[in-house]
């Protein structure tokens, strides 16, 4: 089941983020950099703000939280961003990521395009987005919490 995240879900989201990040980025981002980011981006205060200002969805499997997705609302230009989509490793490949993605897309009927930024080495995510119609626009180098990364920018056309 996919539903909106509530304040009661904050601890579960923090746990999903921690486990998913360790699994996803184990060979891409050093552990200390991951922890630094998780402490900031997934603090209770930050998650509460994200719940108020964004589309924040939870995936449940047999009534247990196992994944989440976070989208910005469509801006005045018709653009939105998928800022996070994570599913616990044991629950990947069963369609929950797809359900989270399409549930978020339903929330932006008047949008023009949805952007997502993916670490270039995150092949699983790249395959996932390309499977559902995202197109890679560019790749660029940047620093993430002081750590050099190569990032791929993808776009999905919302009204084509």
What spans do the regions from the language model cover?
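Residues forming the Rossmann-fold NAD(P)(H) cofactor-binding site
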Residues: 98
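Conserved active-site tyrosine of GNAT-family acetyltransferases
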Residues: 128-129, 134
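Conserved beta-strand-loop-alpha-helix junction that forms the acyl-donor binding cleft
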Residues: 115-126, 143-148
């Amino acid at each position: 089941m996919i539903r909106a995240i509530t304040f009661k879900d904050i601890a579960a989201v923090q746990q999903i983020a921690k486990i998913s990040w360790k699994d996803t980025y184990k060979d891409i981002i050093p552990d200390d950099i991951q922890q630094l980011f998780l402490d900031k981006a997934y603090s209770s205060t930050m998650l509460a703000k994200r719940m108020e200002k964004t589309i924040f969805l939870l995936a449940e499997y047999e009534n247990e939280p196992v994944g989440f997705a976070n989208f910005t609302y469509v801006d005045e230009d018709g653009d939105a961003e998928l800022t996070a989509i994570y599913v616990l490793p044991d629950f990947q490949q069963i369609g929950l990521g797809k359900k989270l993605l399409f549930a978020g897309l339903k929330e932006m009927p008047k949008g023009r395009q949805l952007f997502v930024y993916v670490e270039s080495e995150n092949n699983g995510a790249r395959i996932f987005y390309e499977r559902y119609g995202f197109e890679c626009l560019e790749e660029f180098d940047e620093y993430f919490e002081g750590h050099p990364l190569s990032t791929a920018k993808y776009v999905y056309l919302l009204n084509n």
